[in-house]
A protein has these predicted regions:
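Gly/Pro/Ser/Thr-rich low-complexity, intrinsically disordered segments predominantly at protein N-termini
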Residues: 1-169
């Protein structure tokens, strides 16, 4: 039995953090209704074996998974097709480095980082350099360029910037 586990204690989410996650999940849910894919809020965990052999449990703020049978117990063991993290002062560094690296190594095709204070969305797309996965910032969405906000790998899914941030003062 391998007990080489890694647990990261994270502070509780702010109300703004939860509002953005709820708004995102609500927008995407209906658009995936006739699909094999599902959108999940931040109560779903993924367990992966990292390249160094340690098992890592990660709970994204939101994810879209099209292989929902890939579970072990209460955890998904496959990689989702999309993950989203909402920044907070206590998680920003980890979301931008640790989680981003884990998601990249698990080859998750698309990663969004949302800054609720600045009302900015960073859109990262996975590509390969010398056969190694790497995220590239393909867009930064803010109030001034908010039109046409779509997921790269789910182009039929429309995200309304104003709805995403509704309820945030």
């Amino acid at each position: 039995m391998n007990l080489n586990l890694s647990i990261t204690d994270m502070a509780g989410a702010t109300i703004e953090h939860s509002i953005i996650i709820t708004n995102f999940v609500n927008m995407v849910y209906n658009q995936l209704k006739d699909s094999t894919c599902r959108v999940f809020p931040d109560n779903v965990q993924y367990k992966w074996i990292l390249s160094d052999g340690t098992e890592k449990t990660v709970i994204p703020d939101a994810s879209i998974n099209c292989q929902i049978r890939g579970k072990r117990g209460n955890s998904f063991i496959n990689a989702p097709q999309f993950v989203l993290e909402v920044l907070s002062p206590s998680t920003e560094k980890y979301d931008r480095t640790g989680k981003k690296d884990i998601y990249c190594n698990e080859e998750i095709p698309e990663y969004w980082i949302i800054d609720p204070k600045k009302r900015v969305i960073e859109v990262y797309d996975l590509d390969y350099v010398d056969d190694k996965p790497q995220y590239f910032l393909v867009d930064t969405i803010a109030e001034e360029n908010k039109g046409g906000l779509n997921l790269i790998h789910f182009p039929h899914i429309k995200i309304d910037f104003d709805v995403l941030f509704s309820g945030i003062e």
